[in-house]
């Protein structure tokens, strides 16, 4: 069950809860019930982190997940509130396709991807999930895809060209 709650603690980070599941560990004496939480934390300017927490109580599991997400933050370079180019991310049986969108399009993404884009500050993007829609796999695949975004400087260095050649600046 995907539940997207938004919080702001005053440190400028946006916290979103992706899912909370009841999990069971079977031992010799019976079953031990616990809760597992999956969260993302973003700074609204391209920063994003994912965390998982597990505890016997929901609030403690969510708190652990938020702390882990803050610890696992990474920075993605945004371009006018969207991604610079189309990317594909994979994790397990999940494949996500993330495409840039024109200004005014909004976030066309389902499930946990919407929460990630909102926390990051991406306002115009189109995304599609192929394969498994397990929230954990979708979050990991989305972060994998976002980490593959290249800046024009990286593309120019890889091709051995100048940035002006890549962007077409000055050519008519």
From Swiss-Prot:
Keywords: Ribonucleoprotein, Ribosomal protein, RNA-binding, rRNA-binding
S5 DRBM domain segment(s): 13-76
Leader peptide range in chain numbering: none
NCBIfam families: rpsE_bact
Entry-linked SUPFAM superfamilies: dsRNA-binding domain-like (SSF54768), Ribosomal protein S5 domain 2-like (SSF54211)
Functional note: With S4 and S12 plays an important role in translational accuracy.
Gene3D superfamilies in UniProt: 3.30.160.20, 3.30.230.10
Organism: Chromobacterium violaceum (strain ATCC 12472 / DSM 30191 / JCM 1249 / CCUG 213 / NBRC 12614 / NCIMB 9131 / NCTC 9757 / MK)
Gene name of the record: rpsE
Entry GO CC: small ribosomal subunit
PROSITE patterns recorded: RIBOSOMAL_S5 (PS00585), S5_DSRBD (PS50881)
GO MF annotation: an example: rRNA binding
Free-text comment about domains: The N-terminal domain interacts with the head of the 30S subunit; the C-terminal domain interacts with the body and contacts protein S4. The interaction surface between S4 and S5 is involved in control of translational fidelity.
Family recorded in the similarity comment: Belongs to the universal ribosomal protein uS5 family.
Annotated GO biological process: translation
Listed name of the protein: Small ribosomal subunit protein uS5
Subunit structure and binding partners: Part of the 30S ribosomal subunit. Contacts proteins S4 and S8.
């Amino acid at each position: 069950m995907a539940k997207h709650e938004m919080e702001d603690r005053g440190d400028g980070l946006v916290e979103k809860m992706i899912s909370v599941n009841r999990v069971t560990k079977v031992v010799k004496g019976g079953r031990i019930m616990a809760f597992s939480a999956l969260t993302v934390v973003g700074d609204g300017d391209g920063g994003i982190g994912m965390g998982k927490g597990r505890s016997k109580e929901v609030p403690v599991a969510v708190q652990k997940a938020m702390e882990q997400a803050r610890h696992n933050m990474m920075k993605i370079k945004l371009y006018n509130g969207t991604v610079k180019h189309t990317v594909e991310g994979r994790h397990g049986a999940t494949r996500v396709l993330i495409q840039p969108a024109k200004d005014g399009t909004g976030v066309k993404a389902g499930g946990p991807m919407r929460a990630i884009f909102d926390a990051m500050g991406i306002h115009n993007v189109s995304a599609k999930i192929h394969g498994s829609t397990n929230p954990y796999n979708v979050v990991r695949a989305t972060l994998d895809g976002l980490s593959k975004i290249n800046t024009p400087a990286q593309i120019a260095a890889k091709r051995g060209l100048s940035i002006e050649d890549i962007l077409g600046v000055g050519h008519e």
